Amino acid sequence: MKRWWFNSMLFKKEFEHRCRLSKSTSSLGPIENAIESKDPNINDTDKNIQSWGGHDNYSNVDLFFGVKDIRNFISDDTFLVKDSNGDIYSIYFDIENHIFEIDNDHSFCSELESSFYRNSSYLNNGSKSKNPQHDPYMNDTQYTWNNHINSCIDSYLQSQICIDSYIVSGSDNSSNNYISSSICCESGNSSKNADARTSDQIIRESSTDLDVTQKYRHLWVQCENCYGLNYKKFFKSKMNLCEQCGYHLKMSSSDRIELSIDPGTWEPMDEDMVSLDPIEFHSEEEPYKNRIDSYQRKTGLTEAVQTGIGQLDGINVAIAVMDFQFMGGSMGSVVGEKITRLIEYATKEFLPLIIVCASGGARMQEGSLSLMQMAKISSALYDYQSNKKLFYVPILTSPTTGGVTASFGMLGDIIIAEPNAYIAFAGKRVIEQTLNKTVPDGSQAAEYLFQKGLFDLIVPRNPLKSVLSELFQLHTFFPLNQN
């Protein structure tokens, strides 16, 4: 015997409301009692099922009830239905006690079915069909009944779930409420009956879901880790952290500056410096200069890094923030020049230095000129650290790879990484294709590399500003307005 469960789970933080709808063989009642009877437990089932056929309203069974009055109809009663596969089920509802019972005992249902056919044939001009499966009146009426009652039940259950969700939450804020409804069948012979939808229906539903997703994608940000949706309006205030799993998603350079630097203290440097096409890089898809212009319009930036001076908890700092949204944060001649000028300014003014790394490496469109930036920046850092004895902190975010990792990304006095950051010199795909070896999953994640001693701290975004402030004060950099 099959057993069907309908689980409706509503979560709101620590609150859990579960409506378990299970099967019982003792709660069968006649369908005519859907209007008259209050007692769902009636023993003389055969007799009562036959009396159903005696009602004149059977011919209008498709108008028996609608979605509006289904609550009264199914409040505490049982009725017989037949699905499109020919399986007979007795269904029992008790909304007040959250009970939804389905029974498909084959021996019992066969007896009910034969009784049903006999009485339906009697109604059809008083004749009895020898083969009820070919009774056109019976098939048409039962098909209409099945479709109508299934749609009414579905509509009612969905409306009840929505109403319960609203009452429990006290608001329509869906960010704290998650409704999960599932129907599963515990049966050894459910593979054929599990999905009766046609391929055309599935394609239409998938197309509809895709259209809805595309229509509202500007309202949500999907997590790369758990694939949960985060409301974009509050995403920035939560520091681009996933509400479901806490995963650190990518941040723009402007958002990072706003997060780290005190309001009203940011002074950008070299904003008018833009890339040209020094080696006249040829591309069949799009010229390099046009691609630069496209990213400038898309991001509102002139290059893949923002540099400037600001205050962090009242402490003057020089900071460079790379932006992965601009050509993958790749390091070209302008990126290298802006960072070098910032380091030279910090050396001259004796300022602590922060560089937030988010890059795919050197920019191939500029050839060897982009590789030269590694040596140029490293040389400026040597003077800053070794000769002037100043304090430099790189912050490695996801991803930090290639020439950035091989140069200033790993030259800090104290190296900080974000949780779950992807940090590598060569990417996983490049290593596997070059060496023909499999790179283990997680071997280039911040947590694994931290255990190998590659950097000093893993700091989440929430306490990052206070951690930097303490490090600067430990190295004798104090706020200007300290009382």
From Swiss-Prot:
One of its GO terms (molecular function) is acetyl-CoA carboxylase activity. Its EC number is 2.1.3.15. The keyword Aminoacyl-tRNA synthetase does not apply. Pathway: Lipid metabolism; malonyl-CoA biosynthesis; malonyl-CoA from acetyl-CoA: step 1/1. It is found in: Plastid, Chloroplast stroma. GO terms for biological process: fatty acid biosynthetic process; malonyl-CoA biosynthetic process. A zinc finger (C4-type) spans 223-245. One of its GO terms (cellular component) is acetyl-CoA carboxylase complex. Zn(2+) binds at C223, C226, C242, C245. Its cofactor is Zn(2+). Binds 1 zinc ion per subunit. Residues 219-483 form the CoA carboxyltransferase N-terminal domain. The keyword Plastid applies. It catalyses: N(6)-carboxybiotinyl-L-lysyl-[protein] + acetyl-CoA = N(6)-biotinyl-L-lysyl-[protein] + malonyl-CoA. It comes from the Eukaryota. Keywords: ATP-binding, Chloroplast, Fatty acid biosynthesis, Fatty acid metabolism, Lipid biosynthesis, Lipid metabolism, Metal-binding, Nucleotide-binding, Plastid, Transferase, Zinc, Zinc-finger. Belongs to the AccD/PCCB family. NCBIfam families: accD. Component of the acetyl coenzyme A carboxylase (ACC) complex. Biotin carboxylase (BC) catalyzes the carboxylation of biotin on its carrier protein (BCCP) and then the CO(2) group is transferred by the transcarboxylase to acetyl-CoA to form malonyl-CoA. This is Acetyl-coenzyme A carboxylase carboxyl transferase subunit beta, chloroplastic. The gene is accD.
